[in-house]
Amino acid sequence: MVLADGRIVNASAEENPDLFWAARGAGQDFGVATELVFKAYPQSNEVFGGVLYFSLDKLPDIVDFVNGFEHQTTGNEGLFFGFDRPPIVEKTMILTILFYNGSETEAREFFQPLLSLAPTVNETEMMPYIRMNTLMNKAAKFGGRKRISGTNFTLPLDIKLLEELCQDFDNIMKTYPRVNQSALMFELLPYNEVIKVPNDATAFMNRGRYYNVASIFCWHAPEIDSKMKSLQQSMMQKIGERAGIARSPHLGDGTGLYANFVGHDASAKDLFGDSLPRLQELKMKYDPTNVFRKWHDLFDHKNVV
């Protein structure tokens, strides 16, 4: 990392471990990373995955499956679902993305309740693991104006909430011009391994028995910038209040905030929670003049502890 005074240092469990702690979650406040070393794991076998599109009348059945996911998963499964407006039909549909790290037979057995719902589009198959990360590439093509936001959610989900969100999303798609690349996705990735790492092990404080929900709003007309932000934030607030950890604080001591989703809309105090006092101490050691403050200023007046 390049520090505020120009020094180049290593941050690891062996070298500058306090900076290593801070960089994993609050690196934007401490310097510029010029080299990253990751711990990788072999993934030699192919995985089962792909996209399914469903008509909106299948929403209750899909929510039923989602609400049982937590009790059925072994850690080898993943599921995204939400709302999209694919150009091939030009109407709002339910988009799901399946993932199974295992054989096709096992995968089809696990996801049978979804596969049996006669999806309008079924692009599931065995594929190399690295291809899974490309499945959403076509969701937001180059050009135009885009905004990402998100929040957290817990299970079970209320079907009435999902029906409201579907209607809200569909109304936006019908009301505003050239917004049909937008999407709302609930991301069910097993958290069992994630919560084995204590929240105070790094500056990243967003670990708990909950999931992320992400939205990307896409449009082209600058004059509706503020409207798109308002509509998106209103939708995220509805999900957070009615499905997030705000209703279930016993699900962990994580903040429930992911920096890449909340952007500048959350303070460092909200984002880093109990880690903020230590971060402020380390800030005085590594960046006492507060050079790196553009994203989440650790010394902003809102972050008094």
Regions found by a protein language model. Give the residues of each.
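Soluble FAD-dependent oxygen oxidases
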Residues: 1-305
